Amino acid sequence: MPLRLIFMGTPDFAVPTLRELHAQGHEIAAVYTRAAKPAGRGMKLQITPVEKAARELGLPVLTPSTLRTPEAEAEFRAHNADAAVVVAYGMILPANILNAVPRGCFNLHASLLPRWRGAAPIQRAIMTGDAESGVMVMKMDVGLDTGDVAMTDRLQITDAMTAQDLHDALAPRGARLMAQAMVALEQGSLNLKPQGEEGVTYAAKIGKAEAKIDWARPAHDVLRHIHGLSPFPGAWFEVAIDGAPVRIKVLRCELVKGSGAPGALLDDRLTIACGEGAIRLLDVQRAGKQPMRALDFLRGTPLIPPLSVM
């Protein structure tokens, strides 16, 4: 029989899993997500992608500010769920909540644990130059992404992949994997294995100070830095346009042959020298503007050597 589940998630990454579990016939007793926040130019309240999807599916939505009160625990238990599924919820679950459902809480994590425990596994995998990533279903405990692993799906990372590309590849894979895990849980065949502590790394939240491009680094490192921060927060540089510094985010680039002083513009196609080698910018975003192809940017803002970016 299908399970009665509590779903807990917030961003786009979690939506495919919610939809897949619903499509597979599981009874979603409640959807927990973060409260609406002001966003955009008008600072209007914006509900989360998970809340939007839940309402489209006709599912009840809860947005508690904390799970650490007796009232929150009582409400959680009152759903009489078999298990909870957690995907990028954005709030730490205390032990009493983890123990409030008889079959446990299961998390979908976007890394090959124990590598990249923490908040930004997709970005860190690309920024560090990992050859592969993946998604894992684990049974949650009180540690930070330390629970026993139930299922894994691996994916190769290419130089052309941005964080958005990897996110978009892993989200549907994760949805299918969690659905498989819930079938196994229902049938009593879910096999849990401890992670172990060998190879543990932590994916710290991305800080704004990390976003500035360091052109003195080798081209391959610059490419990984750019792609790992694309689209958010976006790796950036500044260039003087009409005598004033203008910040430009780089959303996609490629490795090319070339050499020069780090930050030097090498041609009229936005090829920029790095500490070793060079990169060519493919997609950029000027401050306050929409993302665009680099060649379209150049039509409105020609940049011609000799010129250096900062």
UniProtKB/Swiss-Prot annotation:
Domain of life of the organism encoding this protein: Bacteria
Q: Which UniProt keywords apply?
A: Protein biosynthesis, Transferase
Write out the catalysed reaction: L-methionyl-tRNA(fMet) + (6R)-10-formyltetrahydrofolate = N-formyl-L-methionyl-tRNA(fMet) + (6S)-5,6,7,8-tetrahydrofolate + H(+)
Instruction: Kindly list the GO molecular function terms attached to this UniProt entry.
Output: methionyl-tRNA formyltransferase activity
**Any single Gene Ontology cellular-component annotation:** cytosol
Where (6S)-5,6,7,8-tetrahydrofolate is bound, by residue?
S111, L112, L113, P114
Q: What is its EC number?
A: 2.1.2.9
Q: Does the keyword ATP-binding apply?
A: no
Q: Which NCBIfam families match?
A: fmt (TIGR00460)
Q: What is the role of the protein in this entry? A: Attaches a formyl group to the free amino group of methionyl-tRNA(fMet). The formyl group appears to play a dual role in the initiator identity of N-formylmethionyl-tRNA by promoting its recognition by IF2 and preventing the misappropriation of this tRNA by the elongation apparatus.
Family label: Belongs to the Fmt family.
Listed name of the protein: Methionyl-tRNA formyltransferase
Q: Which organism is it from?
A: Afipia carboxidovorans (strain ATCC 49405 / DSM 1227 / KCTC 32145 / OM5) (Oligotropha carboxidovorans)
